[in-house]
Regions:
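N-terminal cap/lid segment of alpha/beta-hydrolase-fold proteins
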Residues: 1-35
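The serine-hydrolase catalytic nucleophile loop
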Residues: 47-59, 73
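Alpha/beta-hydrolase active-site loop
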Residues: 53, 86-107
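Conserved alpha/beta-hydrolase
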Residues: 60-80
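Alpha/beta-hydrolase fold nucleophile elbow
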Residues: 108-120
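Alpha/beta-hydrolase-fold enzymes
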Residues: 127-209
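Short beta-strand/loop motif that positions the catalytic acidic residue
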Residues: 241-242, 248-250
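Catalytic histidine-centered segment of alpha/beta-hydrolase-like enzymes
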Residues: 279-292
Length: 306
């Protein structure tokens, strides 16, 4: 792949059981191959891919001296797995474990200094896997999105009936078991509905326009996966991450701020809360000023934690 500002970005693959995972490995400028570096596995948002905001953070943290790995989730992007577009929390968590596996095989990585970083839903997955992934020595999220809230409450949609959705999921599973094509719904609308909440407009602008649109980011999901997402609670065991440190980074204007607060309040010390004034959920994806502040905090956090 291309290089930028002395950053070497290389496409790599690594296994998750029988699934081939696709990633981009970023290494620091002027890397000394005789040395070992701290490393980060970077998980992407729901509907996203490694070339978007996860790759942005991976590249910027490599510029700060880290070996970083941004990777596509199983069933998504350039990673393998069928059916395509599945969003399975258990598999997303296993993807992260396998990314750590891969990092431990690299001669340039100090295996005792590996951290996890997740953006949006990726933030919830790194927090969820960390209690039982002891190789992760420090964990951070940026603009965390709790998909359980969306699946159970329909947030940010104003009208939603969970029971009706579950009945529909059951009917769809029965139909698919009898041979019907797998149903996929838009995770990001192809057109912004009239009167849509601002965060939906932000999502559309990021994923569906030249701002960050990528041909491997389909921004759809398997409809029946909503049942799995309803069962997923990212902070169920979050207090067990301690004494390893965790960090939540969120914009003061992010509609999702309450999702990070729920995890932060349940987590044990050492934990940190870092707000970026004026930033919305998606400004922390690619806005240079907002991302710059987030990266500066991440550099400080991982610098003393790994």
């Amino acid at each position: 792949m291309s290089t930028s500002a002395s950053i070497q970005a290389t496409k790599v693959t690594f296994p998750n059981q029988l699934t081939s995972m696709a990633g981009i490995l970023f290494v620091p400028p002027n890397m000394d191959k005789t040395k070992k570096y701290s490393a980060l596995a970077v998980a992407h948002p729901f509907g996203g891919v490694k070339e978007q905001t996860a790759g942005t953070y991976a590249r910027k943290m490599a510029e700060k001296g880290y070996v970083t790995l941004a990777f596509d989730a199983s069933h998504q992007g350039e990673s393998g797995g069928y059916p395509r577009d599945t969003e399975n929390p258990a598999e997303r968590m296993e993807d992260i474990r396998c990314a750590v596996d891969y990092l431990t095989t690299l001669s340039i990585v100090e295996e005792g200094r590996i951290g996890l970083l997740g953006v949006c839903a990726g933030g919830s997955y790194v927090m969820a896997v960390a209690p039982t992934e002891m190789r992760a020595k420090a964990i951070a999220s940026v603009s965390l999105w709790d998909l359980r809230v969306t699946a159970r409450e329909g947030w940010p949609a104003p009208q939603y009936n969970r029971t009706s959705v579950l009945v529909e999921i059951g009917e769809q599973r029965t139909a698919e078991a009898r041979g019907l094509t797998v149903r996929r719904d838009d995770g990001i609308p192809k057109k912004v509905p009239e009167g849509a909440p601002e965060i939906i407009k932000e999502s559309y602008d990021y994923y569906r326009t030249p701002r960050a649109q990528h041909h491997t980011s389909r921004s759809v999901f398997v409809f029946t996966d909503f049942a799995r997402l309803m069962d997923f609670n990212y902070y169920a065991g979050i207090e067990d991450i301690a004494p390893r440190p965790i960090l939540f980074i969120i914009g003061t204007e992010a509609a999702t701020i309450f999702m990070s607060k729920a995890g932060y309040e349940k987590a044990a010390q050492p934990k940190e809360w870092f707000e970026i004034p004026g930033a919305t959920h998606h400004r922390l994806y690619d806005d240079e000023a907002a991302v710059g502040k987030a990266v500066a905090k991440l550099e400080e956090f991982f610098g003393r934690s790994l």
